[in-house]
């Protein structure tokens, strides 16, 4: 429903408490900062992610995906929708004829299987992704090779943050 009344005090903060059951917001200052490599979790050779929100109650994760060398990332299938926004560099899927360049928004529909490639002339790619559900890694014939979901992402974060001295609990700030 559109707003039908005029707010006479638009710069006055809401005066009532938030619901007791509401979880706190997440604010990640300077999320694109390259100043601390410990914040980037290794996922594969030359592939890293920076967690922003790991939602265990709804089964999705939001992260920055960084690739520091050209090449094939992975072939995978999504049973749920994925949203992406390219912040740096570019990439494409072998199965499609478009290229996601810096500033591009990408919607991947449920059921999509694709092979992500960073072109040879790209030194670094960073994309903001929201992945809902799970990613199934497959071979060219669709044979299951592995999977990732919000819980495997959390475990990867715990191990990495412990190893680099931030402590396994560092990941808790991103979990909702």
Predicted regions and their residues:
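A short, N-terminal "cap"/entry segment at the start of jelly-roll beta-barrel domains
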Residues: 1-59, 159-176
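Short histidine-centered beta-strand/loop micro-motifs
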Residues: 63-65, 73-78, 95-98, 117-119
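Short acidic-glycine-tyrosine-enriched beta hairpin
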Residues: 91-115
């Amino acid at each position: 429903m559109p707003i039908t009344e005029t707010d006479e005090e638009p710069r006055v903060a809401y005066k009532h408490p938030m619901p007791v059951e509401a979880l706190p917001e997440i604010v990640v200052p300077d999320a694109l900062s390259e100043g601390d490599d410990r914040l980037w979790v290794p996922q594969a050779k030359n592939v890293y992610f920076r967690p922003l929100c790991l939602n265990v109650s709804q089964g999705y994760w939001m992260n920055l995906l960084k690739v520091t060398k050209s090449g094939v990332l992975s072939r995978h299938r999504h049973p749920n929708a994925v949203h992406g926004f390219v912040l740096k560099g570019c990439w494409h899927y072998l199965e499609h004829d478009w290229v996601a360049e810096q500033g591009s928004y990408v919607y991947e529909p449920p059921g999509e299987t694709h092979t992500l490639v960073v072109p040879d002339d790209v030194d670094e790619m960073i994309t903001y992704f929201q992945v809902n559900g799970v990613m199934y890694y497959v071979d060219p014939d669709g044979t299951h090779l592995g999977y990732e979901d919000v819980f495997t992402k959390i475990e990867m974060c715990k191990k990495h943050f412990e190893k680099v001295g931030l402590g396994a609990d560092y990941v808790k700030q991103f979990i909702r």
